[in-house]
């Protein structure tokens, strides 16, 4: 049952194992009965934080994917798999066992701005077709490297008995953790793949305040879904200037018209000198629009129908 009071906002969903991000969106859409989208795909074998936008919040998805992401990952040494995780077929093996010291020494080459080749089994498009579809058909997939950024990699433990290593990785968008495992294993000469992956955070979303799908359905049954929803402004971060407007200005902006920032609160014209974008809301937090700042005016680019 959908709560009549709930129309829009963000959810911090804890994606379960063996479920695709698209399937999570489908479950949430059924609960809320409105448009739903997610920010940042998680592989079916990964768990953890999946930000999900509900209703008008889908207009702010681009702002949610720009934040830093953190992952807890276990790499299994000794073999390379077709998917670079435990799901794929073994294509190479090695009897080498890397020491903790050798792993630490190799990590430096993967920190900072690096070039990374996405896994063959990925959503990257090749001639208009998803790479994983070609790979599943047995076609050879050659993907060009991408410029990505890994902020930090911490080696948490190295177990020579199980031949695994645990890492905490902080990175920007576009990084494939499976590619990191593959490339680190190759550099160590022992091969490697991801045997466990959990996303701990995406921007302001963290696993500590995430909600399971079962919990969402329980809240829906109790008609209190608003308890799980976060405001649209939750994903805005520091890149956008936040300003309050009165009812008159809000109506002008909602018609797609620009307004002078002198008409906003908090001396908007002065504050906007260091910003390219701004987020306008009514007093009380009701969202109005995301606007581009142009010559002292707010020009709407995303208007919220709430």
UniProtKB/Swiss-Prot annotation:
It catalyses: uridine(55) in tRNA = pseudouridine(55) in tRNA. SUPFAM superfamilies: Pseudouridine synthase (SSF55120). Its EC number is 5.4.99.25. Keywords: Isomerase, tRNA processing. It holds the Pfam family TruB_N. Belongs to the pseudouridine synthase TruB family. Type 1 subfamily. This is tRNA pseudouridine synthase B. The gene is truB.
